[in-house]
Amino acid sequence: MSASVNAEISTTNTKWRNMNILSYNQFDRERLNDMCKVTNAMRAMVATSGGCDLLKGKILNNVFFEPSTRTMCSFETAMQRLGGTTVRILPSYSSSKKGETLQDTLRCLECYGDITVLRHPEKGSVPGVAKYLKKPLLNAGDGVGEHPTQALLDFYTIQNEMDGKVDGLTIVLLGDLKNGRTVHSLARLLMNYDVKLRFVSPESLKMPEYIKEEVQKKLEFTEHENLSDVLKEADVLYVTRVQKERFENEEDYLKVKGTFDINKATLSIAKENMIIMHPLPRVGEIHEDVDSDPRAAYFRQMENGMYVRMSLLALCLKGRGDD
């Protein structure tokens, strides 16, 4: 096991062991700093040795009731690089098909594993079931509610790309802000810092009022329908897809699907050191001709997801506790 990883995990300023990760509101600047330090150590360790045996003998239950590529695979890869193993549970193989409650499913699974990652289509379902469990539970997305581990990797990416600077940035969140759980978590996580937020979306996909009411207590934000209104001032452009699966009918989806179309020409007025982020998958909102632009950070963002999730698994299972 990397000595630097062990040192960072054992010397955090905040306690982590047996922690559930359910919401952005569990993270202040101190806890974020701890996470980033451990994540940096994980990155360095993977670069030099590929992995370690920190979580040898530990089992991750990966429970996904909605489709996932990046979140599911990055958690599995994270666990395996730390020497642990994973059990993948998908709806087609779950006893939920027989009418079993989510509570019972997870209580049974934690008899076999040491930590559980859960994605579920119902808003509030993941925090709601946590009270029945004795072992750590990580929220991998609860409907249109939150996606805290995505917000954490997004924050880490912003900090890393901006050489440690977050205060003073202007961050544009663009796309489906109504249904995008990634931006719901990220906007509020950024309340820990002195940033300016710009919300850009069609009228029908604006950021929910309850989130705006919360954000305005700490941050300056403005709302726009055109990216050109704010692109010149942006340090970070965070793009999200329009989420077809959240629409009740296809006609409403098609009305807004192609609202934003980001290509090389779009970026001609943007700062040279701006970064472009996207939680992926993309469905046409960022052209592939942008991929070669050094400002395109979304694949670096995906790689960061593995390192951040390595740190979260390690901290929740091996981090500082009460002893």
Where are these regions (language model features)?
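Structural/interface elements that position substrates and couple domains in central-metabolism enzymes
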Residues: 12-323
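Short hydrophobic alpha-helical segments enriched in small aliphatic residues
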Residues: 3-7
